[in-house]
């Protein structure tokens, strides 16, 4: 049996190690801009997660990666931040990061992660999502600039990483912490067990 994480995120890799060391990383090369942003955020993140899992399946099929394996399970995941129904993905540059963090300052936002686990041999997929509410304290303009200067905002939905220097912005959290980091591990664990994956 092979377990494949379809993500290059070091944070997701570390979280997955909490339940198993027996997996490999084959990052998805799926272009997220191909999926139209939807107001139905739950469906949107699940479609992104499914697309990433299927993209990785295409990669490993073309490389005869799993021809000798009885079972291959591919984990796709995508995380976005939402405030007032608007999706905040990964910032393109420092200005966009500044705009995002200014908008989140002193307010409550939601973090959504979509999960998709693809059984490559049976061509069966299970999808789900998780939502966590996060409340930020008021953050001064100078503090935001200092945070952006450290570079941690890059490649993170909503321009922050809760597990890093931005942890001081967080006043309250309702729901899964690991979901905010990028991989709702409890939900993933249940999906894998339900699909017969022996962890």
Swiss-Prot record:
Its EC number is 3.6.1.9. GO terms for biological process: nucleotide metabolic process. CDD domains: Maf. The active site is at 78 (proton acceptor). It catalyses: dTTP + H2O = dTMP + diphosphate + H(+); UTP + H2O = UMP + diphosphate + H(+). It is found in: Cytoplasm. One of its GO terms (molecular function) is UTP diphosphatase activity. Its main location: cytoplasm. Belongs to the Maf family. YhdE subfamily. NCBIfam families: maf, PRK00078.1. This is dTTP/UTP pyrophosphatase. It comes from Clostridium acetobutylicum (strain ATCC 824 / DSM 792 / JCM 1419 / IAM 19013 / LMG 5710 / NBRC 13948 / NRRL B-527 / VKM B-1787 / 2291 / W).
